[in-house]
Amino acid sequence: MSLLKIYWRAMQYLAVERTATITMCVASVLVALVTLAEPVLFGRVIQSISDKGDIFSPLLMWAALGGFNIMAAVFVARGADRLAHRRRLGVMIDSYERLITMPLAWHQKRGTSNALHTLIRATDSLFTLWLEFMRQHLTTVVALATLIPVAMTMDMRMSLVLIVLGVIYVMIGQLVMRKTKDGQAAVEKHHHKLFEHVSDTISNVSVVQSYNRIASETQALRDYAKNLENAQFPVLNWWALASGLNRMASTFSMVVVLVLGAYFVTKGQMRVGDVIAFIGFAQLMIGRLDQISAFINQTVTARAKLEEFFQMEDATADRQEPENVADLNDVKGDIVFDNVTFEFPNSGQGIYDVSFEVKPGQTVAIVGPTGAGKTTLINLLQRVFDPAAGRIMIDGTDTRTVSRRSLRHAIATVFQDAGLFNRSVEDNIRVGRANATHEEVHAAAKAAAAHDFILAKSEGYDTFVGERGSQLSGGERQRLAIARAILKDSPILVLDEATSALDVETEEKVKQAVDELSHNRTTFIIAHRLSTVRSADLVLFMDKGHLVESGSFNELAERGGRFSDLLRAGGLKLEDKQPKQPVVEGSNVMPFPVKGAVA
């Protein structure tokens, strides 16, 4: 993407506040025109002094324009600052909203720290560009566009010096941009690596400390910082060279203007006031050209991060649903997977040609080895992904034809990882339903066997749980997650190994709550426990993305297939309160009795 396209796209974000932006632009143009008039008026004052004429009128006009310039500059600075700050926060919020709608696979591939780093650095760069556009860029362009024609009307010979100076600045800028383009892109990559390392180590600080990795991880960060310096310094060298060349060209131009001016005055071809005006023009032009050079530097520096941000914006925009998508209402819970196929890109993993039907109120247990596609099946139900082939229907409606918001409103999920926010206990439960009353929150906690341990905390329901629930035990985290699902009160329930971290006593309490919750609700359970599978109306055995077997527990156990093999191998966890029966090597005695199982 060219530098001009990047700049233009950055400016398009200001269109949301069109009136404020236009007002700032008009004020900036007025400031530029007033600034241009100052050297002319100053020259007239000097000429009036030289001619011993009336200096009061030009002085008064000069003072009036100076006062107006000050007020306009303050107005522009104040308005531009506020507008740039508002748009920075606005773009950050809009982009954040799109980011959190992206599928999990996108976040896993890109990395959370990468997306966060891109968002923060890009919005900071956009803020700087917007601010400089309204404060300096526009006034600089207007000033340069009017300065040369005005100077040419005064003296063509002196104007050539200013034109040559402008050409030299342009040539130097083009040279440096060409030399630093690839280097600046490399700098941005090293910035990402450094940020990712910091984020990775801090999020795993317990591992870093327990394995005595503090010195090693710090040294790794030093290495990343050194690589960043090695990539950054050549770029900085080119811009330092550009600054020196620009300063040399501007100094030489001032000398030429003074020498030519003095020569023309002695020959009677120019007045002293006109020479003074040209000196003011030269100083003004040098200042504006320096601003242009700084602007190019800013844009080149921001180029890589903005290109990455725009690519991220385009990717998230493609995920946005069209307006007026139908909602899924009055869900009964009849669910059909009709020849559903989905495969993760370049992985060979997914689910293939899966078909089954679940009647309203039925409980489905999904079992199978690791990587069988159990979680993928659930993610497809919630439209984290859309099928590549086939269709998923709820109450006869294809889920792709309804809004994700309404679909997910109909599904309450208890994830394997509880996924708690660094907020209070009540706020975490209230994620299930934001407008729930305190009494409803407490009732959900009681149903999930969480109320007693919450009250035992120092702040009760106002206790902050820490980052990802770090201040709670594994069982406490899962009970809050279950309370959240209970509070949501959705017609479809998904439990992803929801009771795996609970002790026997607590699990029994939670199981009763879940049984009550799942009554008359369509329930999917990714199950590792025998009791869960036994009580299910339908068991789906997944392996390598294929639905190998389906039916009731007894049907599959008696069939002598893969599910029966899983039972014989003890692949489902026994309840802790049930004593394990010994297995004699070489015998056909199973670890627990299964009616009709085949030896």
From Swiss-Prot:
The chain crosses the membrane at residues 22-42, 55-75, 156-176, 248-268, 276-296. GO terms for cellular component: plasma membrane. GO terms for molecular function: ABC-type beta-glucan transporter activity; ATP binding; ATP hydrolysis activity; ATPase-coupled lipid transmembrane transporter activity. Residues 335-569 form the ABC transporter domain. Pfam families: ABC_membrane, ABC_tran. ATP binds at residues 368-375. Involved in beta-(1-->2)glucan export. Transmembrane domains (TMD) form a pore in the inner membrane and the ATP-binding domain (NBD) is responsible for energy generation. In NdvA the ATP-binding domain (NBD) and the transmembrane domain (TMD) are fused. This is Beta-(1-->2)glucan export ATP-binding/permease protein NdvA. It comes from Brucella suis biovar 1 (strain 1330).
